[in-house]
Amino acid sequence: MASGSADESAIPMMDDYQTLISTTDVELLKTAWRNEKAAPEILQFEAALVQRIKEQIELAEQNVEISEADNVDPLTVSLYQMDLDRTQFLLRSYFRVRLQKIEEYLFHILKTDHLLNRLSKQEQVFARRCTDDLGNHLDDTVLSKLPDNYQSILKQSTTSETDDMVPEPRLDTFVICKAKQYLSNMDFEPDYSMEITEMEKDLLTFVCYKFIKKPLEMGKIDLV
């Protein structure tokens, strides 16, 4: 009887958990992760979504602990634990992909305002610390031993007009995408409106990334 009572008392809490950990947010996180993984450049950090997911994870952890203490059916608890693990994995993967891009295009992001603004505050701190650490390391081990004309971490020499040592994402990379709605040439970048004139809803399209940057940023397209 005690076990049955414990099971019944846990049901409202599990119902609250189910309400809060909405499928919509999990699917949105999947979409954000796929977009980030497929895009050659860093995308806008999904701050509101990440905050909601963190709150849902915290509640899920509490529910699992309470359910175990109340001797709720182990199978039920394991299902909730699996759902929790899946959400945590997605969130970690989302962070990991973004950090990899920040490390790869570190200097380019920091010198490009609109890209820097796409980072979270924590990511901006990480990027600046990486820049300082990398700059100090290269200066101590290599650059300080080179002639003055070749001591820049950004340029091959002082005669270079641009930062030719800074890698940039290749926006001419081809990606697979799917439109959430019908798109006409007005939905794409004006410079490329002749390259891509329309896109049907839910139709997979293999296209140059820079052609679909605008609708992607507006949430009209998802990458695959």
Predicted regions and their residues:
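Surface-exposed beta-strand edges and their flanking turn/coil or helix-capping segments
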Residues: L99, L106, N117, E189-Y192, ...
